[in-house]
Amino acid sequence: MGPLPRTVELFYDVLSPYSWLGFEILCRYQNIWNINLQLRPSLITGIMKDSGNKPPGLLPRKGLYMANDLKLLRHHLQIPIHFPKDFLSVMLEKGSLSAMRFLTAVNLEHPEMLEKASRELWMRVWSRNEDITEPQSILAAAEKAGMSAEQAQGLLEKIATPKVKNQLKETTEAACRYGAFGLPITVAHVDGQTHMLFGSDRMELLAHLLGEKWMGPIPPAVNARL
């Protein structure tokens, strides 16, 4: 029997493109590194407010850098990420509250579907320039992730319940307690210690903390399938 997997938590919001990048890299490595990957749907607007941080859209130079950066990362990481056409509206007006409540409901009721459902919401907003705020948009993502129409509708009906609202609030507050000022954050629990890493570009450091080998963003086992 091999060593027990170490726990790594990923706090993320589908409104955050860098969360998608970190998510995919961790999904590629979770079996290679033998980690217990825990996905934590969170609300980036709550973290921004709590920390006093500002979104890139309010800082023009940062927004321009982000657009160029994601274009380069699309090819480097082989993730089909594209800037939304109406970036400011997506980030500052539409937001992701309903989507993140839906993913919270998925995590509570059908955690085995969380990875695919999260990916399909990212694909909508950060790859195909599609909506993630309307009920039909969320249902379309859920069904594309493999849920039945009835299952998806049942989960959607729970996003306004106190249980789901409170869980999303608690997860967001947990990220803040770890010191988050944005997303994604990766929290590694290793040898009785807890390490919080911000951003999608800290995976080499995560490998070091885990005592594992970093083989680039597309490890050989994954590259063979791409």
Curated annotation (Swiss-Prot):
One of its GO terms (cellular component) is peroxisome. Glutathione binds at residues 16-18, 53, 183, 200-201. InterPro entries: DSBA-like_thioredoxin_dom, GST_Kappa/NadH, GSTK, HCCAis_GSTk, Thioredoxin-like_sf. It catalyses: RX + glutathione = an S-substituted glutathione + a halide anion + H(+). Its EC number is 2.5.1.18. Keywords: Acetylation, Peroxisome, Transferase. Ubiquitous. One of its GO terms (molecular function) is glutathione peroxidase activity. The modification N6-acetyllysine is found at residues 71, 85, 116, 158, 165, 169. GO terms for biological process: epithelial cell differentiation; glutathione metabolic process. It is found in: Peroxisome. The modification N6-succinyllysine is found at residues 49, 116, 144, 158. Gene3D superfamilies: Glutaredoxin (3.40.30.10). It is an enzyme of class 2 (transferase). Homodimer. Glutathione S-transferase that catalyzes the conjugation of glutathione to exogenous and endogenous compounds. Significant glutathione conjugating activity is found only with the model substrate, 1-chloro-2,4-dinitrobenzene (CDNB). Belongs to the GST superfamily. Kappa family. This is Glutathione S-transferase kappa 1. It comes from Homo sapiens.
